[in-house]
Amino acid sequence: MGHVLEFVQADVLARMWRAAGDPVFFSTGTDEHGQKIYEAAQKAGQKPEAYIDHYAAEFQKLKQLLNLSSDAFIRTSSPAHIAAAQEMWRRCAGDIEKRSYTGLYCVGCESFKTEKELVDGKCPLHPSLVPERVSEENYFFLFSKYQEKLLTYLERPGSIIPEWRRAEAIAFVKGGLEDFSISREKKRLSWGIPVPGDDTQVMYVWFDALTNYISTLGWPNDEKGNFKKFWEEGEVLQVAGKDQVRFQSLMWQAMLMSAKIKNTDTIFYHGFITSGGQKMSKSLGNVINPLDLVEKYGTDAVRYLLLRHVSPTEDSDLTLEAIHDHYTAHLTNGLGNLVARVMKLCEDNLDAPISVPEGMQGAEEITRELDNFSFNSALEIIFSRIAAADERITKEEPFKVVRSDPVRGKLMLSALAAEVWNIGRLLTPFMPATSEAIQKAVLENKKPENLFPRL
């Protein structure tokens, strides 16, 4: 669910910026190397290559199922990405040295842990996994060298959203940075990108995976000019889960500094989604499959549920019961019912479609909320307009007036149709298919098919 949440959040922002006339490059993808992938493939009785092909195909399905407007899907097993990761290594070579190392490795996080990061000897994010004590010769990135430069980067408000994640990152850096391992011995882990010039080592998965942010743009060759346009000259936003602050805001930024590449402008972190107050787990039987939700409720309903009823930045709890209640109350009885009522009255009583207004009432408020990554607040503004339109119908009773005073009644219906049109346009980045259906209904002066059937 976390991946689906960030895909949809990023899609809303991409659609908003495109609508404003800004060029956008929106990329998603899959990290396909590392011990976790290798062990999962073994468990499935497959070779890593076959396993990741299936894994990537499942993620690629999400583009259609969630109606994502993404421009690229980057696989870290692709030849272009492998070449980019190796070039990143070469450009960081002045900050890389080989050392012998012993440490505790969490396969779930794909990272080494210090004793102070563990709770009762286990990773707090993966308590079912016992960290593996690893002793081997690895290449290390001189992370400690970048302490002051990272603090300077983090001092800029807006470098990390929300603000308390920025404070968390600053505190981590001020606590002192330790150089970190960026390779594994090939004899222990063969599934990885080869280290340039050393056949005995493969890259640590995070060094490889983080490079996807620029490999997807065609770096280092940049034959299409996308890297220059969107990274060097554009404004770069990364969307990630709260457990990635150390990797995205510190490790990756230090790598970029070392390679003399511009740093990310903003990184937005979302919270976790729990179910019934607990982390989703097959053993607990509380896993919510987003694909099942799309099949039952439809794409736009799932987008709505994630954007309005999940906090953009804090942990949120979702249950199947709550999802059904939100769907019924806000989509079936709310938005869907309003559009059906108004357009049925218009179809029966107006001689022609209304002349739709050019502007959008409330657009500036929506943009302001989205600029602050407040997806839920933006939707609350739109749904308050839906509630207000419902109240207007109840109070003014246009269905009666149109019979007793046709001229006044038709004016009332035209005004309601204009508001339905306005609501439809405001919904465009959040619920694009629903937005299109609403606008089509107003332009044709017809009641649409049931937008959100009662389930």
Q: What kind of region is each of these model predictions?
A:
Residues 25, 29, 46, 101-104, ...:
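Basic, alpha-helical terminal appendages of large translation-related enzymes
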Residues 94, 108-111, 125-129:
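Short Cys/His-rich local motifs and their 1-3 flanking residues in nucleic-acid-associated proteins
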Residues 344-359, 377-381, 393-403:
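Short acidic alpha-helical/loop segments enriched in Asp/Glu that coordinate divalent cations
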